From Swiss-Prot:
InterPro entries: PSII_Ycf12_core-subunit (IPR010284). Its main location: plastid. This is Photosystem II reaction center protein Psb30. The keyword Ligase does not apply. It comes from Cycas taitungensis. PSII is composed of 1 copy each of membrane proteins PsbA, PsbB, PsbC, PsbD, PsbE, PsbF, PsbH, PsbI, PsbJ, PsbK, PsbL, PsbM, PsbT, PsbX, PsbY, PsbZ, Psb30/Ycf12, peripheral proteins of the oxygen-evolving complex and a large number of cofactors. It forms dimeric complexes. The gene is psb30. It is a single-pass membrane protein. GO terms for cellular component: chloroplast thylakoid membrane; photosystem II.
Length: 33
């Protein structure tokens, strides 16, 4: 695998994982308030 392809895959996975995580964090913070 090329480094470019690997980098793109890692960035894609990070975005896919961080999306729901950010939403969950916001929901938890709103619930605490």
């Amino acid at each position: 695998m090329n480094l470019e392809v690997l980098a793109q895959l890692t960035v894609l996975t990070l975005i896919v994982i961080s999306g729901p995580l950010v939403i969950a964090l916001l929901a938890v913070r709103k619930g605490n308030l």
